[in-house]
Regions:
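N-terminal active-site segment of His-dependent metallophosphoesterases
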Residues: 1-32, 168
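Cys-nucleophile CN-hydrolase/nitrilase-fold catalytic domain and related Cys-dependent amidase chemistry
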Residues: 19-107, 173-200
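CN hydrolase (nitrilase-like) catalytic-core segments centered on the catalytic cysteine
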Residues: 57-80, 141, 147-252
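Short beta-strand scaffold segments in enzyme catalytic cores
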Residues: 81-83, 94-97, 133, 232-234, ...
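A short, polar/charged loop-to-alpha-helix boundary motif
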Residues: 110-124, 249-267
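Cysteine/selenocysteine-centered motifs that mediate thiol-based redox chemistry or coordinate metal-sulfur cofactors
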Residues: 130-162, 262-287
Length: 287
């Protein structure tokens, strides 16, 4: 199939809302639909609280995966589903790839795990062990990174080299109280660069809303507040924004791409032909 329609869903957290928005996106003709990172629950990584470990589930038990498998089958859509995964005594930040027949093609576990006062993910997630992966779905070969992965050009390049035709980044990002800056433009430009450098469309879906941590004995009286800035977008193969959302409203973005035409453009530029991997030894060392 040459043409494919993708969608980014921007919303506050909640499974019921996610199901509703996926149905709406499918009704608009979307075939591959991206929801935000960890959309089932509030962004619990704002605090260190052992009680939040109970939010982790196995793939088989996860409510979002099970509900969206049915939606995928009924509407013939592909859904990368972000969730908090438990495997034995280990927990991961994971995306399950649900194909258009409702089957799970496989999973990707987040590689890069951030850690500061407002994004305390190292407390909850073990660094992923899957490596970057690409799935041959019903509509396209897709690669998926998760939030902080989107800041690393290596992530996108690995997926491109593995044959991805589209890149997807479920996200939960907002205000930066420590840095005291608005990171949104930087965030967008970073991924637009990945799209341009790999000559590959890219979809990013972020949540919205303000989420506040209430101090308690369980979280050592921590306090925190994050305002997620939405601004979800779809970039084309040149990195140009072809669809973009605002900062604070529920939105569904859709766009149709001609994968055959993009493949020819990618070949014509020669950026993969002219790579010199033998010269990139520094990439294997810490900076």
């Amino acid at each position: 199939m040459s043409k494919v329609t993708v969608a980014a869903i921007q919303m506050p957290y909640g499974l019921e809302t996610a199901v509703e928005k996926v149905r709406e996106a499918a009704a608009q003709g979307a075939q591959i639909i991206l929801l935000p990172e960890l959309f089932e629950n509030w962004y619990f990584c704002q605090e260190k609280n052992y009680e939040n470990y109970h939010l982790a589930t196995t793939l088989e038990e996860n409510p979002a995966v099970n509900e969206l498998k049915k939606i995928a089958r009924d509407f013939r859509v592909v859904l990368p589903v972000s969730y908090y995964e438990r495997v034995g005594n280990t927990t991961f930040n994971t995306v399950a790839i649900i194909d258009a027949d409702g089957s799970v093609l496989g999973q990707y576990r987040k590689t890069h795990i951030p850690d500061d006062h407002f994004y305390q993910e190292k407390f909850y997630f073990t660094p992923g062990d899957t490596g970057f992966r690409v799935w041959d779905t019903a509509y396209a070969k897709i690669g998926v990174g998760i939030c902080w992965d989107q800041w690393f050009p290596e992530s996108a390049r690995c997926m491109a080299l593995m044959g991805a035709e589209l890149l997807f980044y479920p996200t939960a990002i907002g205000s930066e109280p420590i840095l005291d800056c608005d990171s949104m433009p930087h965030w967008r430009r970073c991924m637009q660069g990945h799209a341009a450098a790999n000559i590959m469309p890219l979809v990013a879906a972020n949540r919205i809303g303000t989420e506040v941590v209430t101090p308690s004995p369980d979280n050592q009286n921590q306090t925190s507040s994050l305002t997620f800035y939405g601004s979800s977008f779809i970039a084309d193969e040149t990195g140009a924004l072809v669809e973009q959302a605002g900062r604070d409203a529920d939105e569904i973005l859709t766009h149709t791409f001609d994968l055959d035409a993009i493949r020819e453009l990618r070949r014509s530029w020669g950026v993969f032909r002219d790579r010199r991997p033998e010269m990139y030894g520094a990439m294997g060392h810490f900076g």
